[in-house]
From Swiss-Prot:
Protein's name in the database: Hypermethylated in cancer 1 protein
UniProt remark on domains: The BTB domain inhibits the binding to a single consensus binding site, but mediates cooperative binding to multiple binding sites.
Superkingdom field: Eukaryota
Expression sites by tissue: Ubiquitously expressed with highest levels in heart and lung.
Quaternary assembly: Self-associates. Interacts with HIC2. Interacts with CTBP1 and CTBP2. Interacts with TCF7L2 and ARID1A. Interacts with MTA1 and MBD3; indicative for an association with the NuRD complex. Interacts with SIRT1.
All residue ranges annotated as the BTB domain in the record: 47-110
C2H2-type zinc finger locations on the chain: 437-464, 507-534, 535-562, 563-590, 591-618
SMART domains assigned to the protein according to its UniProt record, in alphabetical order: BTB, ZnF_C2H2
Annotated positions of the Omega-N-methylarginine modification: 159
Interaction with CTBP1 as annotated region, ranges: 241-247
Gene Ontology CC terms: chromatin; nucleus
CDD domains: BTB_POZ_ZBTB29_HIC1
Amino acid sequence: MTFPEADILLKSGECAGQTMLDTMEAPGHSRQLLLQLNNQRTKGFLCDVIIVVQNALFRAHKNVLAASSAYLKSLVVHDNLLNLDHDMVSPAVFRLVLDFIYTGRLTDSVEAAAAAAVAPGAEPSLGAVLAAASYLQIPDLVALCKKRLKRHGKYCHLRGGGSGGGGYAPYGRPGRGLRAATPVIQACYSSPAGPPPPPAAEPPSGPDAAVNTHCAELYASGPGPAASLCAPERRCSPLCGLDLSKKSPPGSSVPERPLSERELPPRPDSPPGAGPAVYKEPSLALPPLPPLPFQKLEEAVPTPDPFRGSGGSPGPEPPGRPDGSSLLYRWMKHEPGLGSYGDELVRDRGSPGERLEERGGDPAASPGGPPLGLVPPPRYPGSLDGPGTGADGDDYKSSSEETGSSEDPSPPGGHLEGYPCPHLAYGEPESFGDNLYVCIPCGKGFPSSEQLNAHVEAHVEEEEALYGRAEAAEVAAGAAGLGPPFGGGGDKVTGAPGGLGELLRPYRCASCDKSYKDPATLRQHEKTHWLTRPYPCTICGKKFTQRGTMTRHMRSHLGLKPFACDACGMRFTRQYRLTEHMRIHSGEKPYECQVCGGKFAQQRNLISHMKMHAVGGAAGAAGALAGLGGLPGVPGPDGKGKLDFPEGVFAVARLTAEQLSLKQQDKAAAAELLAQTTHFLHDPKVALESLYPLAKFTAELGLSPDKAAEVLSQGAHLAAGPDSRTIDRFSPT
């Protein structure tokens, strides 16, 4: 039996429920969610993965990368630090790919560069993005790039290679007329609106070439004449890609005034006389702006910088404007092949900035110099000491210009360094603070690691000046057969412990036995022995023999803790730390005290516990840890640790082994247990403390108490002697 009224109410309820669900839907929820995630990425908030491309570092979220790229999904499962092949994707291209993942669109500057005519031999930006998207397996980006390239009729040219006139060289191979040291140089033009001109074999005419400021990345045209300039990218943030290079690039050239489609009033914290911040409006369609003159890429002779009002400058700089290097130095990015300052890790002394610091001068104190908090001392010629020559008169040249892995900085005429987005000069990114790098011996702080290294080298020179004559006298005396001066062996390890050299230089190098008076100077010296280690840390410069060791070392800099406890969520940087922590949850205590029977989860806790027993006798503590490697004792000539035992312990142990005819493994057990008991035999007040190890000794060896007492009584008188000796671990054989 049915009730029509009930059916009507049920249907009306379903309709009302459907209407309620429709009203709860937020059409722009997914877009807002991506926008919030992108904001968190730019601020480094809750980022759980770091992608390293060349010398640039990018923070991101694992879930977002795994949902967008099948290739990245397979990587983020296993590690929190990813290294991408820089032959397949460059830092500038990966920045665009990461922006697409978080926003769903490519920037206008890339589309304009792909739509504009490019010089023969140069590769289009959109083609590089397509190659990177294919490598990272991002199908949406691949489809978008192919669609845009087909629209402009350039997809077939990419397939055909660079053999034809107007075609483009494949990604990763330099075109004709380009040097191999600049594999990622791209052309960028400003024609956001209007039909693109057809590609021609002849490059655009003009007296100069063009430089584009693309979020602290450099995009320079080929060696041909000029093109026009592309506006900076809108969403520029240095947090998207942080530079891990040890050395900073030069800030010797800066445009007279940033080109912009729309100007904003200067920021309140802007330096006096600085230009306004700029950004690009999406709806604007302006004609191409006139190019700026600059040094040609192929010109190897350094000349005065045209951007600083000298040589061919369009005009002098406005008075009161700060030096361009002081504004742009910190935020210049390293593009592969454009001044590979990131590849150098241990710099020989001799650059102008280092010599200035070694002489005791402060860069902030020099008149007309950049402020200390913003710019380190310039390391390139042509910035302070004149064009092309350092402080000691040596010319700076690129050591491997044609291979792309230069060890030394290139001259200003050889490579052009990048310019950041204009608002980066006003200090908008997060503040890292001043003087974070502190010299341990003197406590002086510096804003950059290269200034600290130069300062430490000044300590080395000062030390050599103070003790150079003493070392020379020692060498001369040793050659004459008179022995080292001061009668104490100088500062060698074999000298007397109380020698003058031992007191003045207590820190020694394990490789060459050189000694220094502070650990910071010793670490600086140890870097000279790292030449055979091919894997350097791009943050501190330390080198390693294996890539895995370098990756684990970088976790300490980046704050990565990939090993997490499943029980409590606590994270660790090393696997063995997690193993020790898991014993807290499992209750496992593998380390046992052989004196009192106490058990511990970690070996360091047992060592601390044995120090308590060492108050009554140091021999008992050392013997209890004989099976665990022993306490750290006095190292001998072979580098092995020694243990201090009373003289009678070895006599009793050897006597016990001979009379009981023990096996090899039983002899070691007898030596350990006797070392724990015999030092108590001469003191009747503490005789009860020996009951536990003695009972354990008899139980393990299967001896009766009478037999054990008889053996111990024969050697007990030897244990009463106060003398002790330091020998190797006891071996009954």
